[in-house]
Design a protein with these regions (language model features):
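A C-terminal junction/extension of Radical SAM enzymes
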Residues: 202, 210-237
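N-terminal [4Fe-4S]-dependent radical SAM core
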Residues: 1-24, 38-42, 65, 69
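Short, conserved acidic/polar surface loops in the N-terminal third of protein domains
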Residues: 32-37, 44-47, 87-88, 116
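Electropositive phosphate-/nucleotide-binding environments in soluble metabolic enzymes
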Residues: 26-29, 52, 56, 145, ...
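A short alpha->loop->secondary-structure connector
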Residues: 40-52, 98-99
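Cysteine-centered iron-sulfur cluster-binding motifs in ferredoxin-type domains/subunits
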Residues: 24-35, 81
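Conserved AdoMet/S-adenosylmethionine-binding subsite of the radical SAM
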Residues: 55-210
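N-terminal export/assembly segments and adjacent metallocofactor-ligating motifs
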Residues: 26, 47-48, 64, 79
Length: 237
């Protein structure tokens, strides 16, 4: 649990300068070899320090933070993959809305249609990781491109949710200009107001022998995306 600027989620175009109470746990439903936070996402209960916080306790904590800091506007479900415990996110989000707090979801988007449609009414802003734009690539990572596309389509067309999407430009996985062109065109077909982040990969977890993505590659992919989307940002450069 920590207070973070919204830009750290990252959310570049939603309540800039504001802060959220960020909460996370352990575990993930994907196994990306390039995971940037594998220390918690790939661990179980015995691998990380944790404590139980009820939904009401979390909302009360957020309200206390907001009372002491007017810049705190809500709760972000983040760090590991929040949807592995989606019922907790749902219960917290419902209570947060009743208390006048905003909800931010930072997720890989790999969840069933029923889960996303149950959560969508309570999500005010989201950043969804779009790991690559290949069904085969997603299978290699233990996920489903179809599920992630559905999540993006639901949140991207919601009248109450601001959506940003992040693609980490991993060498040999998601650094193809052709794939980025297809991805950006599809995102624009959902909603051209979707904000896209193209971020630079650094060696992590099972890809420590890889080289960081060249900055020029990230910039080139962002330029390709801008052919379709007006709101494109680069990160880690």
């Amino acid at each position: 649990v920590a207070i973070d600027p919204v830009e750290k989620k990252p959310l570049a175009e939603w309540h800039p300068g504001s802060r959220v109470l960020s909460v996370g746990s352990y575990g993930c439903n994907m196994r990306c070899p390039f995971c940037q936070n594998f220390e918690i996402s790939q661990e179980g209960a015995s691998g990380v320090p944790w404590r139980e916080v009820s939904p009401q306790e979390l909302v009360d904590l957020a309200l206390d933070c907001a009372e002491r800091d007017s810049g705190v506007i809500g709760i972000a479900y983040t760090y590991n993959e929040p949807l592995v415990g989606w019922e907790y996110v749902r219960d917290c989000s419902m209570l947060a809305h009743k208390a006048g707090l905003a909800n931010v979801l930072v997720s890989n988007g790999c969840a069933s249609a029923q889960v996303i449609e149950a959560l969508a009414p309570f999500v005010d802003a989201a950043n969804i990781d779009l790991k690559c734009f290949s069904a085969e690539g997603y299978r290699d990572l233990g996920g489903s491109l179809e599920d992630v596309r559905h999540t993006i389509a639901v949140l991207g067309t919601s009248e109450t949710c601001h959506l940003e999407v992040t693609t980490l430009a991993v060498p040999g996985v998601s650094d193809s200009e052709d794939a980025m062109r297809k991805e950006a065109a599809w995102l624009a077909s959902v909603n051209e107001k979707i904000v896209l982040h193209v971020t630079r990969f650094f060696p992590r977890w099972h890809m420590t022998d890889a080289q960081p993505t060249p900055v020029a590659t990230v910039m080139r992919l962002a330029d390709v995306a801008r052919e379709y989307l007006p709101h494109v940002h680069v990160g880690n450069c």
